[in-house]
């Protein structure tokens, strides 16, 4: 593995996953995220009691929203230092060869991603109680699929079925969903 890609993946995980999961499941922000934000003068102002509130504010049930995977690689070009600070300063999007796509929205369809999320929660966050709060497939101009007064949405049935298969796999491996 390319070390620069591994670093980009780590930063994306910090920004898009751990910045939300760690406070509500561990009671603190990841130290490496805090250091990164501080080094770019992006750390929000906090009061001394904020740390206590975060530590005590753990949740009982986690809602998971999953539509598509986020795949990243190291940046191919330098960042414009005059541009606003964004997570994308640290990585570029990566397009997996042979990926399955939702042609109506341009999103990758990767049903095993729901399983990956559950395994991460089980192995790295103490297997919290969770549920899938959002998952689905957006399609533009669905009226074009109307046949005899009914929408032929086999594409959506297949999407949900594939995701439920991977959800079931996670549950069968003792994920608490």
Regions found by a protein language model. Name each.
Residues 1-177:
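Active-site region of glycoside hydrolase catalytic domains
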């Amino acid at each position: 593995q390319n070390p620069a890609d591994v670093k980009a993946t780590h930063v994306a995980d910090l920004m898009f996953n751990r910045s939300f999961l760690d406070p509500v499941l561990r009671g603190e922000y990841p130290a490496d995220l805090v250091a990164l934000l501080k080094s770019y003068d992006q750390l929000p102002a906090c009061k001394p009691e904020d740390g206590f509130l975060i530590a005590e504010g753990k949740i009982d049930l986690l809602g998971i929203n999953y539509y598509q995977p986020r795949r990243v690689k190291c940046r191919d070009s330098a960042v414009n230092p005059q541009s606003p600070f964004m997570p994308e300063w640290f990585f570029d999007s990566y397009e997996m060869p042979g990926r399955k796509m939702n042609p109506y929205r341009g999103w990758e369809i990767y049903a095993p991603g729901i399983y990956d999320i559950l395994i991460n929660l089980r192995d790295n966050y103490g297997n919290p109680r969770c549920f899938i709060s959002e998952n689905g497939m957006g399609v533009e101009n669905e009226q074009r699929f109307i046949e005899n007064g009914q929408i032929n949405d086999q594409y959506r049935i297949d999407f949900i079925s594939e995701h439920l298969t991977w959800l079931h796999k996670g549950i069968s491996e003792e994920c608490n969903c």
